[in-house]
Amino acid sequence: MTSSPNSGLALSLAASSLLSESDSQRYLSQAKAQRKPFVTFLIENEILDSKALADFCELEYGVPLLDLAAFDLAEIPQKYLNQKLIEKHHVLPIYTQGHTLYIAMSDPTNVSALEDFGFSFGLHTEALLVEENKLTTAIGKLLESDQDALGMEDIDESEISELEVSDENSRLDESVNTTDDDAPIVKYINKIMMDAIKRGASDLHFEPYETKYRIRFRIDGILHEIATPPVNLANRFSARLKVMARLDIAERRLPQDGRIKLKLSRNKSMDMRVNTLPTMWGEKIVIRLLDSSAARLNIEQLGFDDRQKAQYLRALSKPQGMILVTGPTGSGKTVSLYTGLNILNTTEVNISTAEDPVEINLPGVNQVQVNPKAGLTFASALRSFLRQDPDVVMVGEIRDLETAEIAIKAAQTGHLVLSTLHTNSAAETLTRMMNMGVPAFNIASSVTLIMAQRLARKLCDHCKAPEVVPEAELLELGFTQQQLAAGLRLFKPVGCKDCSGGYKGRVGIYEIMLMSENIAKLIMQGANSLQIAAIAQKEGMRTLRISGLEKARIGVTSLAEINRVTTN
């Protein structure tokens, strides 16, 4: 039973002359008598047009308008589909962003709906305006559907018919063959993987808890809950995934690592890296999707400004020296390095890489998977590379003094060396190497460029909306008075059928520091990272924060996203 309609919208319609005051009150009374939402009554009785009413509400109340007919209802997190609340308020929760739950409604004055959902789920709530007829259709589809526990009726058989484990994975033993009892699990996991690939997820999380089993996707760096299948299926999920990854099904006490190669079609496949972790309630399994297309990115797609692009290309063109890319896990370091290797990858150049693991196959590049248990470390691989007549060497990560010293030796003896470190800024990379024990003169003479980076979510071009921010706040964030005087046009996320909560894709934010005479002197003097960063900025280095604010200024991302990935 829906809640009684309130008079807020009726008063606005009367004031706008869309309805007379007497008609507005009469229709409101009739809606109350029939226990129908006011908007539903108006549209069902063809008193107002659904689209015209939605357009009026958008202008009157400033609530973003969403085309619900184009929204994929399958993406709605199941745990928020509270039938009682949906029917009571005639609204539909459609997605979350951070700690905010977005509610689709045709009457933006329905504050009680936002309060009830917020109280029930412990989240902040925001309204999204939708057309009444589309809202009614969507609610009907969701509430009338009779799905089984896994929602198998929604799976398109033709869509996943060619999704299978490739031969190299399935030649294990007879345990790969599934029984009839396992068929629904196989089918469901195939659907989950296909959905992850379609939505551009980088990671899949299969997580068992005491009373719940949760599946999440990491999309554009943010985790989203996708499904909550019955908890009693947890062991069958982990068994199937371990079979696909060629892991020991019986071993549940220790972590395991494996790979899955999925055949998507006759000519296309997808590599996945699998890790299992024993927890209190079963095995948590995380699958990393290794997108080979990421290795073929054009440098224009990375997000450099013109100056940064020129600096990176100039460093890549040098016959020797060291290029270091730094940032936290998931900041896009591998993609930046692979893009650089693709630029260098010609028949005249011998390239060798030591990686842990080899994430993406690069034809024409000699890629080595390090295996410390067998004695093949980054350091030992590097030593071998130097006897292989290399031009370019990439080391997945400089983790210790031994690896750092060999990499520097290579960079000083006619080789171009690329590698990564886990530091927060370009300047901190230099002090990290000094703290490892690398002599200052070796750092100053070998390093040519250090690039710190982050990945920020890009605003969806289809739905981003202008954002008004007080001048004082903009100055505090890092914008200059000159930028404010020139005029800023900032945008914020909204959310539509084309995106995930207002964002779609990611873009790199970079801080590039070149080795200069002044910085080399500071290194020799044992200066700290703050002193080095100050000189680098005087010489023209853009910090991560400044680069991020520029991305917000030109409408690529939002201020909220820059605040999330950078510090002032």
UniProtKB/Swiss-Prot annotation:
Q: Record's Pfam families?
A: MshEN, T2SSE
Protein name according to UniProt: Type IV pilus assembly protein TapB
Q: Which Cys residues form disulphide pairs?
A: none
**Would I find ATP-binding among this entry's keywords?**
yes
Q: Which Gene3D superfamilies match?
A: 3.30.450.90, P-loop containing nucleotide triphosphate hydrolases (3.40.50.300), Type II secretion system, protein E, N-terminal domain (3.30.300.160)
Query: Which keywords does this chain's UniProt record carry?
Result: ATP-binding, Cytoplasm, Fimbrium biogenesis, Nucleotide-binding, Protein transport, Transport
Instruction: Show the NCBIfam families listed in the entry.
Output: type_IV_pilB (TIGR02538)
Would you tell me the Gene Ontology cellular component terms? cytoplasm; plasma membrane
Tell me which family the UniProt entry assigns to this protein: Belongs to the GSP E family.
| Coiled coil segments of this chain | none
Q: Which residues bind ATP?
A: 327-334
Coding gene?
tapB
Q: Which locations, inside or outside the cell, does it occupy?
A: Cytoplasm
Q: What does this protein do?
A: Involved in the translocation of the type IV pilin.
The Gene Ontology biological process annotation of the record reads: pilus assembly; protein transport
Keyword set includes Oxidoreductase = no
